[in-house]
Amino acid sequence: MMALPAFAAEYGEPDITPQTTMGEIRSNPSILGAGVWTYSKEQNLPGTEDWCNDQTLEKYVSSHVAQDCADGLNLLIRNYNAGVQITYKLYSEQEIAEDSSRNNVEFYYYPASTPDAKYALVLSGNIFNRTAELKECISTAYQLHQKGYAVFVMRYRAYPDNDNNSPMEDIARAVKYITGHAQQFGVQTE
């Protein structure tokens, strides 16, 4: 019998199913290490943690996308465990110091299986008052990955807490970043 490497305890298992609770997902070491946001804005309010964490993934995201969402999270875990950087901040520390609302602007990277792939930037929510990366993007990211795309799941600023152009600035920043790092991500720029 082979012993596990010493670092194995630092990684989570890619064993998420639609019946896994949100608390179990949020405590998975690889989800934590990857830095993926697993809340919707309205569900990260003080006093709602237990209610949210006790829900199954299926109840949280809905039954029609739960399996693809679980598969997408498991893919993310496998990528993270293999040393792939998942989360990319889109603003520098100086830019965040100038405007703290930029701190949460980031994307989550799902590399394609082959180099020089097309890519998709997946957005969630309604830009006005919420984003919902887990509920609306992870399943889509998985489906697109299965079709050969590199996928970037975007977390952007919503309007109520920011000026009217903030979401558009964030999306433009993401496209510019991906294009500028196309070779690193193994994606086509057109």
Q: Which residues fall in each region the model found?
A:
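Short beta-strand element of the alpha/beta-hydrolase
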Residues: 117-126
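Short, structural beta-strand-to-alpha-helix junction motif
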Residues: 10-35
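Short amphipathic alpha-helix adjacent to the substrate-entry channel of hydrolases
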Residues: 133-152
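N-terminal cap/lid segment of alpha/beta-hydrolase-fold proteins
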Residues: 29, 33-115, 162-164, 168
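Gly/Ser-rich "nucleophile elbow"/oxyanion-hole loop immediately N-terminal to the catalytic nucleophile
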Residues: 177-190
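Serine-hydrolase catalytic-loop signature spanning alpha/beta hydrolases and amidase-signature enzymes
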Residues: 127-130, 151, 177
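Sec-dependent signal peptide cleavage junction
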Residues: 3-10
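Short beta-to-alpha linker loops that shape the active-site pocket of alpha/beta-hydrolase fold enzymes
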Residues: 126, 155-159
